[in-house]
Amino acid sequence: ILESDHAPHTIEEKDKEFDAVPSGVPGVETMFPLFLYMVKKEILSFERLVSSICENPSDLLNIPKGRIEVGRDADFIVVDLKKECKIKSENLHSKCGWTPYEGRSAIFPEYVFVRGEKLIEEHEMLGSKGFGRFVGEQ
């Protein structure tokens, strides 16, 4: 299983003595694009990425996600591995306004669908705040 840390502390919150700094980094929005870049560079297979991020976690928690099958949520992405870009904090949506991955190569999904609804198209957020929902262990 591969997972992301996401601790969206601002630069101001991080600008303290080491023992007073909140731990973690923002990572939820950049994790998958960084791994997709690894797929393009043949460091990681696409099958291993899908099983590690989608299939295995949904199997472990017994939730209806992780695969495109009847009876599961219609969550999926559309990716073009030829569309590589550099990560820029101004293009991300986290409240913290920075990323430790600034300038790294990545491949962001062209489209993101959640429960069959298109939420992202060509890096633009179409969905409204609050569309997501918590899905706990079944």
Functional labels for PLM-detected ranges:
Residues 73-133:
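C-terminal cap of metal-dependent C-N hydrolases
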